[in-house]
Swiss-Prot record:
Subunit: Forms homooligomers and heterooligomers with other GPCRs, such as OPRD1, OPRK1, OPRL1, NPFFR2, ADRA2A, SSTR2, CNR1 and CCR5 (probably in dimeric forms). Interacts with heterotrimeric G proteins; interaction with a heterotrimeric complex containing GNAI1, GNB1 and GNG2 stabilizes the active conformation of the receptor and increases its affinity for endomorphin-2, the synthetic opioid peptide DAMGO and for morphinan agonists. Interacts with PPL; the interaction disrupts agonist-mediated G-protein activation. Interacts (via C-terminus) with DNAJB4 (via C-terminus).
Name of the protein: Mu-type opioid receptor
PTMs per UniProt: Phosphorylated. Differentially phosphorylated in basal and agonist-induced conditions. Agonist-mediated phosphorylation modulates receptor internalization. Phosphorylated by GRK2 in a agonist-dependent manner. Phosphorylated on tyrosine residues; the phosphorylation is involved in agonist-induced G-protein-independent receptor down-regulation. Ubiquitinated. A basal ubiquitination seems not to be related to degradation. Ubiquitination is increased upon formation of OPRM1:OPRD1 oligomers leading to proteasomal degradation; the ubiquitination is diminished by RTP4.
Extracellular side: 35-45
Role of this protein: Receptor for endogenous opioids such as beta-endorphin and endomorphin. Receptor for natural and synthetic opioids including morphine, heroin, DAMGO, fentanyl, etorphine, buprenorphin and methadone. Also activated by enkephalin peptides, such as Met-enkephalin or Met-enkephalin-Arg-Phe, with higher affinity for Met-enkephalin-Arg-Phe.
Organism: Cavia porcellus
Single GO term (MF): G protein-coupled receptor activity
TM ranges: 10-34, 46-68, 89-98
Pfam families: 7tm_1 (PF00001)
Keyword Transmembrane among record annotations: yes
Subcellular locations according to the entry: Cell membrane; Cell projection, Axon; Perikaryon; Cell projection, Dendrite
Length: 98
């Protein structure tokens, strides 16, 4: 269990969480597509669109963060020992969500 608490695994979990939350909007978008209109009201429309965009940008930021993390791990392995910690990964993920 403790071996699973690496920076890479924390980023992967964050990406999976963002994608799972994005799939929660799919039923609403499917109904909208099939009916050709939005039957759920204005407030739910704004909530679903907000969740969808929020998770889309979080996924993009997380993928960029993972790319930078891999770059540091491969190109600067000595510096990576200090930088790639679970605590730093959690801090970066919180910033991605905000």
């Amino acid at each position: 269990y403790t071996k699973m608490k690496t920076a890479t695994n924390i980023y992967i979990f964050n990406l999976a969480l963002a994608d799972a939350l994005a799939t929660s909007t799919l039923p609403f978008q499917s109904v909208n597509y099939l009916m050709g209109t939005w039957p759920f009201g204005t407030i739910l429309c704004k909530i679903v669109i907000s969740i969808d965009y929020y998770n889309m940008f979080t996924s993009i930021f997380t993928l960029c963060t993972m790319s930078v993390d891999r770059y540091i791990a491969v190109c600067h392995p000595v510096k990576a020992l200090d930088f790639r910690t679970p605590r730093n990964a959690k801090t970066v993920n919180v910033c991605n969500w905000i």
